UniProtKB/Swiss-Prot annotation:
It is found in: Plastid, Chloroplast thylakoid membrane. This is Photosystem II CP43 reaction center protein. It holds the Pfam family PSII. It comes from Acorus calamus var. americanus (American sweet flag). GO terms for molecular function: chlorophyll binding; electron transporter, transferring electrons within the cyclic electron transport pathway of photosynthesis activity; metal ion binding.
Amino acid sequence: MKTLYSLRRFYPVETLFNGTLALAGRDQETTGFAWWAGNARLINLSGKLLGAHVAHAGLIVFWAGAMNLFEVAHFVPEKPMYEQGLILLPHLATLGWGVGPGGEVIDTFPYFVSGVLHLISSAVLGFGGIYHALLGPETLEESFPFFGYVWKDRNKMTTILGIHLILLGIGAFLLVFKALYFGGVYDTWAPGGGDVRKITNLTLSPSVIFGYLLKSPFGGEGWIVSVDDLEDIIGGHVWLGSICILGGIWHILTKPFAWARRAFVWSGEAYLSYSLGALAVFGFIACCFVWFNNTAYPSEFYGPTGPEASQAQAFTFLVRDQRLGANVGSAQGPTGLGKYLMRSPTGEVIFGGETMRFWDLRAPWLEPLRGPNGLDLSRLKKDIQPWQERRSAEYMTHAPLGSLNSVGGVATEINAVNYVSPRSWLATSHFVLGFFFFVGHLWHAGRARAAAAGFEKGIDRDLEPVLSMTPLN
């Protein structure tokens, strides 16, 4: 469909290239973008852009289903999940599927069902994506005005924003319903070493929930990443889901105020940049969450956190040397500080040695040994249970270090053990991807602002190597 207005008016960004190549009628002449600019050619073709997005969703869901089944096929129930390089099954186990006391996997069938459901969904999405990319209407405005839009239409854009917020709110409530009514979720803090339980006593106090947002992000405080009980996590999802749904209704029913109309750039590329910025923030927060938090990401499935492995090693050697007759309360280490125990700056009794920097750690296997002033010496002498020794020895030897140099005193393996913790994978990948998304946010924000100001002419492509090559067609 040849558009009626001058594209240059809407695309001050010129992309110079071999303009003769036409791909399915969406060539450079009609769109202002060459074939390699991908979906930019579809900016004003709402029907085709829908196809691209649905097909992309299909690819995502296909990966989830296929990877899920791959992990099920390779899963060995006798080994912990974190020893098997799994990144999807730990998420399903955390939601309470297939696991029992202590995080032991008792049934892999729910995991199989999850994989199959995702595969079937991906087929539906894939069909829809191909249909809308190849067969469906190029634009939706004429035939399906509810689904059509113009990027400059501020009211329509905030309506779409509202619909998205409502869907996110429903997603948050799905976790709430799973925890409250549909079998519960895995609680690493359940007495006796973790179990699946229904959450009955939600934390809905705004001072507690929003108190997390007001905390310092630094050690001992840890902002929202410091959440360490499921009541707060599920209660937070009630608040978040409610805010998203109410905000969604608000954005559907209202038009942007004058200050908002002035403050934002209202173009497709601007919305892309806002979305990328939000995803970058999500990525950075997820990175910190999976690295430091052992409640939302239980160590039974993801392996210990770095601080947890370090403290576990200190605990393991305290147990060993105490059995050999050491007086762990008074033994002096090579620095003159306590070898096994010392005091934190605020007076608590903490583990000595290099792990002192991780004295904030809270973990289910360690908390029973604490008293009102930190670690309780009499409990360390009389109350250590075999399950605590086993778990700390296991965590000590499965630190999520990769090849870090600063390891909190953990004895590292150089060439014997082939082990990378899922925490390392998930934290690193989310940091790196979050950073890429942040760069994309800056790039597209700059282009969108320049285009809105009317002075962006694109990159000078006179020396583009591709210009000297034979045209593809």
